From Swiss-Prot:
Residue numbers binding L-methionine: 56, 99, 239, 270
The protein, known as: S-adenosylmethionine synthase
Annotated residues for binding of ATP: 15, 164-166, 230-231, 239, 245-246, 262, 266
Gene: metK
Free-text remark on how the cofactor is bound: Binds 2 divalent ions per subunit.
Amino acid sequence: MAINLFTSESVSEGHPDKIADQISDAVLDEILKQDPKARVACETYVKTGMALVGGEITTSAWVDIENLTRQVICDIGYTHSDMGFDAHSCAVLNAIGKQSPDINQGVDRANPLEQGAGDQGIMFGYATNETEVLMPAPITYAHRLMEQQAKVRKSGKLDWLRPDAKSQLTFIYEDNKIKGIDTVVLSTQHAEHVDQKTVFEGVMEEIIKPILPSEWLSQNTKYFINPTGRFVIGGPMGDCGLTGRKIIVDTYGGAARHGGGAFSGKDPSKVDRSAAYAARYVAKNIVAAGLADRCEIQLSYAIGIAEPTSIMVETFGTGKVSNEVFVRLVREHFDLRPYGLIKMLDLIRPIYRETAAYGHFGREHFPWEKTDKAEALKSALR
């Protein structure tokens, strides 16, 4: 009997890095609405009193970067200077240039199916049957706590809540099966006038208890709610934020490997993003088909080359067939060339801003979460 602990964290939509991600993806969405062929690599930096939007964008679209940036910050909830960041008064700086023609000539082709990868790199996808969304439980419930924090904050039920927050969950596993939750950490920015007792009780009753299944909690579960005792200064006033700095929060909470490439602000020609989505799609369909309890996919690409340079499948001893057979199945049933996976998942759409908070995976309405290949995979092995 092997017992171990595993921990994952999430952050709220008001965390500085997530503000940056949401601005970058909002810019991407607005451009894709007007110009599906745009090439976008948009980066954002936020700090007290300012947001800097930069990167390389080649497009026929026009986007009011300043107003869009202010709208995103406002939607998150930073609408008054007493929060340390105000959508209405912060400076918005624009430092956007064009994509290098050296990159462009390797990506664009007369035949779309020959479209090359926008860069070299490695990408991972993962799925596990330990939750109904085929995601690891620690990251899934850490995200749900953060979604609940935002819901309660925006409803006004706890009017002292502010946008910046973080969660962290430590799960107990016995022989790779969940036995319970060992530790809950939740820190949330709050108004200056509220005391620690009020914060603790409010967070427990309105955020934690409605989300975490009671069967996973016990008298031994430890709760650390705002453990420093005070969290008034938050958001970009507390820390600067950058696009692409929460890549583990965005994916599997450390339960699977990561290729290192961030997602937000990148159009689907960037395989850092689109191939990571495709790898999740492949892994999820293998698990949904009942062919493995856990599955990790690695893909790799070379800049300007359409076919993946490698495909790896790992099922951690839970697969119904060998990993070599899985690789053959993947090649037969999934088109993992850049244009192929874009078509397969219908990625040239303005769907990205929503991905930029609460995780890119495990939310069923995104196209890479479909399990429409599961039956075909099962049939191929009969």
